[in-house]
Amino acid sequence: QRPSILYVLPSNIGNLLGTVNVLMEWKRRMGYEVNYISSSAVVNNANNLKNYIENAYETWDNPPEFVTLVGDAEGSYDIPTHFENWSGYNGEGDHPYATLAGNDLFPEVFIGRLSFDTQSHLQTIISKTVNYESNPYMGENWFKRACLVGDASTSGVSCIITNDNIKEVLQNHGYEDIRTVYSGDFPSQMTSNLSQGLGFFNYRGFYGVSGYTIEDVSSANNGFM
C-alpha cells in the first residue's frame, strides 16, 4: 500500500492552490497518495479538523500516515492550533491532531506545519522542499550528522535524559556523528552546528531559556545541507 499524505489548506487558499499543487504533484511522483481538504466547515475549527483527520484515519481505504497543515496558526492564511490546559500555561501545539486512537499521547500519524504569511513565503517553502528532495546535496556525509540540545540549567535534567534516549535511537539507525549541547554558550554552539549541516536537529527545553533568538536562526548558513 502506498504511503498517504493529507494536506490541510486554509479555506481562503484561492489562487495559491496552484503553488501548493507543485508540492502535491511532486509527492505523487514520489509514489505517495495525496489528498487535501480546504473546506471552511472543517479547517476553520480545531475540533472539526481533529474529527476529520480521525475519521480519515479510521475509515479511508488508504488512511493518511502524514498530515501537513499549510498555514500559520494566526494570520492571513491560517489553520487553527490547539491549546493545552494541563500545565497552566495554555501552550500552543498541533500534536492533538495526531492523537487519533485511545486515551494516550502517542501519535497515530506524523504531523507537521508549513507556516506562511504571503504567497512569496509559500513559494519559497515549497521550492526549497522540492529542491531538497529532488536534488539533495551529496558533497559530504552531513545527513548522518545530528545535534541534540538539552537546556538543563532551568528546564530540568529531563532535557538531557530525553536527548540521551534520542541519541541511542539515532545510533541504531546509522547516525555516525552525534553532537550534544548540554551546557555553555547555547546560541553559538547551535549556530555552529546548524551551519555545518545536519540530518537531524533536536532542541529540548523551554523557549527562550537558552538565549537562542530569531536573529540567531537568521545567522545560520548551511547552504543546501
For each predicted feature, which ranges?
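Cysteine-dependent hydrolase recognition
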Residues: Q1-M225
